[in-house]
Design a protein with these regions (language model features):
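Juxtamembrane intracellular "pre-TM" segments in multi-pass secondary transporters
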Residues: 1-17, 195-248
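Helix-loop boundary and gating motifs at the non-cytosolic
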Residues: 2-63, 243-287
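Substrate-agnostic recognition of the 12-TM MFS/MFS-like secondary transporter fold
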Residues: 19-36, 61-76, 80-92, 108-168, ...
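Helix-to-coil boundary motifs at intracellular loop junctions of multi-pass secondary transporters
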Residues: 45-47, 78, 130-138, 268-273, ...
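A helix-boundary/kink motif common to multi-pass secondary transporters
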Residues: 50, 80-81, 105, 171, ...
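C-terminal ends and interior cores of transmembrane alpha-helices
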Residues: 90-104
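MFS-fold secondary transporters
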Residues: 98-100, 116, 189-190
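Symmetry-related core transmembrane helices of the 12-TM Major Facilitator Superfamily/SLC fold
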Residues: 174-192
């Protein structure tokens, strides 16, 4: 039954949408192989760092995810999805290579958390914004978004599980090699990704007409001015829409609670459960099971007859 549910979203997707789902799945799986084991695991097990260090890693990671998402959104608006995707690939590969080259000292790992967070945030529009470059049909958008959500949750299972096996066989830093492999696979999957020119033009037109200030900034030769206006427009859009504002608050509070425990989780594995760094991946992947089941259920409800 579960297999049939997994095949259901793909059967209704266009070829371009399938490319998009594969791109997101592969690049996000790469990130999932590396964050918990590669950053937090290295600090806890290899460096024997303190809770302060893991807390800083989580803080830096999440702050730069936000900054990266702002930068990624601005880059997408300015250059379109194909160039944005190539920049996301380059950023992920450069991050993995830098962490591998410069070693596992605590300061280097914290810098790695910064780079990884920015790269992850920069790539986030692949999931959130690319579907609108393929279609404006509400039903098709719902199918694409549901498939992306489901396979993103599959990444939460696959990534840490594979990362655990790599860490068990080699070291916690070796997971960044795995991240780079998945990034290259994402590039291969995205090679045939061709957003319709008309859709891209229409979206750029919508962005240009979203406000007089944004229009002026888009014509400006100063990229930083355009980026700042884009950020301000995005924030205004969220907080002037009650549904988006409520969704923002729900996501913020849920992640706030998760973030409070995140720096301590690795010490629980090491000092209470007395397991190796590989178990950080294997046990954390279990949280993805419920996420996948929830995404599949949402997809089933969306596909039910009579749904808007």
């Amino acid at each position: 039954m579960l297999a049939s549910l997994f095949s259901k979203p793909q059967s209704s997707l266009s070829a371009q949408a399938k490319h998009l789902v594969a791109m997101r799945f592969l690049i996000y799986t790469g990130f999932q192989t590396s964050y918990f084991i590669g950053v937090i695991g290295t600090l806890t097990y290899a460096d024997d760092a303190s809770v302060v260090a893991t807390s800083l890693a989580v803080l830096f990671m999440n702050v730069f995810v936000i900054l990266g998402s702002f930068a990624g959104g601005a880059a997408l608006d300015a250059w379109g999805p194909r160039r944005h995707f190539l920049l996301s690939i380059v950023g992920a590969l450069a991050t993995g290579a830098a962490i591998l080259v410069f070693g596992s000292a605590t300061g280097i790992v914290l810098l790695g958390a910064v780079l990884l967070g920015f790269a992850l945030g920069f790539a986030q529009p692949i999931a959130t914004s690319y579907p609108a470059y393929l279609t404006d049909d509400p039903v098709e958008l719902k199918d694409i978004n549901s498939a992306i959500a489901m396979f993103s949750n599959v990444s939460i299972i696959v990534g840490p599980t594979l990362g655990g096996f790599v860490a068990a066989a080699t070291s916690s830093r070796a997971v960044f090699v795995l991240m780079m492999i998945f990034t290259v696979l994402a590039l291969v999957a995205g090679w045939g990704f061709r957003p319709q020119a008309g859709r891209v033009a229409a979206r750029e037109s919508d962005l240009a007409e979203s406000g007089a200030t944004a229009s002026t900034a888009s014509q400006s030769s100063n990229p930083s001015t355009f980026a700042c206006v884009t950020f301000a427009t995005s924030i205004k859009t969220v907080f002037t829409n009650s549904v988006l504002a409520l969704l923002f608050c729900i996501i913020f509070l849920s992640n706030f609670g998760y973030g409070a425990f995140d720096p301590l989780e690795s010490f629980f594995y090491r000092d209470v459960l007395h397991v190796g760094v590989e178990w950080m991946g294997w046990l954390s992947s279990a949280s993805g099971v419920g996420a996948v089941l929830g995404a599949v259920a949402a997809l089933t409800l969306a596909a039910a007859p009579g749904q808007p």
